[in-house]
C-alpha cells in the first residue's frame, strides 16, 4: 500500500486480475484504489508487522474490505465502533498472514461477510470465530454490554432487573424453541457467543455474590412457567405455518395473481375507453330487466351470461357506485323509508339526493352506449342469431318508478318529484322486461337473499313498488294510442281522455278502457302535481318531454309465478315475445367498443 515501507501500491491480490485489464473503466478503478491506499496511512496507524510493534489486533477493526468502495465499520448505540471479527478469523478466511498488508486496511468487514475469493477458488460460506472483548481475550463476550451502557438501564435495582428480564427472556425463548447449547442450526464455534447465564450476570452485577435480589428470586421461581409459555408460542407458530403451507400450495402463484389483480384494479377506465380498437359491428337487441327488489333479475342475467357467452353483454346494477362512491345512497334511502317521516322537507331533500345519485350511472352509460351505435345501418327486426345487450334496470326505475312510489308515500315533494322526472331519457329500441311476482313469493326471496339494508322492507313496500310499475305501464299503453300533445292537454285540465277518444277519427280503443288506463296511470298523478301551476311553460314542457320519451320504449311482461325455478322457460317466454313484436328491433353496435366499456363498468362494480 502506498506510504507503507516495502509495499507496492495497488489493490490486494484478490483484485489483481481487474488491474491487468487496461480498459478505461478498470483504469479508473485502479486510480481509485491507489487513492484509497494513499489515504489509508493518514487515517489510522497500522498495526501488526507494518507498525513494527508486533501487537495483535484485539479490536478487530482493521479488516479486508469485501468490495470497493469499502464501508466504514458500524457503530453501536453508544457511538463506539463495534468489533466485527478477530485477526485470526481474517487470516483463516483470506489465507493471509497476520503480518500481511491486508490487516492494515483502515476499513472494517461487516459481520458475516467474506472477501471475494481468488478466481481459482470457489466462494465458501464464512466460518464464525469467537470475538475478543476489550477487557481481554480470555473472557466470554457479553452481548448485553450495550444494553447496560444505555441511559435507560443505568442506576438502581430496577435497571438491573430490566436487564435481567431481557436476558432471561431470550434464554427461555431459545429453550422453548428447542435451541440448546449444541443446536443443529449453530456450529460448535458459535457456542462461545452464548449469553451468560442468569447466575453469572447477577454475579457481575452484585459484586461477585451469586444470590439474587428479591425480584430475581421471583423471576427465577417463575422461570419454568416462562419457558412453557415460550414453548407453546413456538409450537403454535410452527403449526400455523404448516396449516398455511397446506392451504396455499402455490404461494408464489397466488402472490403473482394478487399483484396482477391490484394492478388491473388500479387501471383508469378512461384509458380503455379512448384507446383505438378495430370496430366489430354486430346487430343486438337491448333488454332492460325491471321489477321489485328480489324478483330474480340478477339470477336471470347470470344464467343468460353463462349460456350465451360472447353473444351476450350483461350490464350489472351499479351497486358499488351507489354504496361506495361518496356516501351510501342505498343505506340512506332505506333509512328514510323505514323511519317513515312523511311530509317533511328535510326528508324530501335527502330522498331527492339519493334518487339523483341513482340516476347518474344510467344516464352516463346510456350516453356512452349511444356513441357506439351505428346509425347508418338503421334497425331491423330481431333475428334468431342476433346478439343481446342485457341490463339490470333502466333509467325508468330510478327517475320515474321509485320517485312515483316515494311521492305517493309522502316522502318526496311535488317540486322534488318534477326534478327527478326531468332527468328521464330513453332511446328508440329500449325494451323493458317487467318481471312480475306475487308479494308473498317476492318477500320470501327477499329474506332468503339476506341483505342487511333490506331487512326493514315489508310486504307493503313491495306492493307499492308493483303499483308504481303498473302505473308506468298504463301510461305507456296510453302513449301507444294517443298523441303526446293530447295527453298533456288532459294533464293540464284542458280536456278529458273521453273527449280525446270521441274526437279521434279512427278510434282504436274504447273510451271506458282509456278512462280506466288514465286513472291507473302516472298521468293522473301528474295532473295533480302541475294543477297549481298548470300555466307554467316549464312544467308543461317537462310533461311533454316525459310523454314523448316514454313512447320510445317497448314492454315485455313476464309472470314469474308460472316459471318457479325455471330460468330456461322464463327466457323462452321473453325471447318469443321479442320475436313476435315487430316494434322490438335490433340495432347495430360497435361490439368491441361496447364490450370494453361494459368490462370497465363491471370491474369498477367488483372493486
UniProtKB/Swiss-Prot annotation:
This is Thymidine kinase. It is an enzyme of class 2 (transferase). SUPFAM superfamilies: P-loop containing nucleoside triphosphate hydrolases. Homodimer. Residues 88-106, 148-160, 194-203 have a biased composition (Polar residues). Its EC number is 2.7.1.21. The active site is at 317 (proton acceptor). GO terms for cellular component: host cell nucleus; viral tegument. ATP binds at residues 291-298, 445. Phosphorylates and thereby activates certain drugs like acyclovir (ACV), valacyclovir, and famciclovir to a toxic form, that leads to successful suppression of the infection, while the uninfected cell does not have this ability because it lacks TK. The keyword Protease does not apply. Belongs to the herpesviridae thymidine kinase family. PANTHER family: DEOXYADENOSINE KINASE, DEOXYNUCLEOSIDE KINASE. It catalyses: thymidine + ATP = dTMP + ADP + H(+).
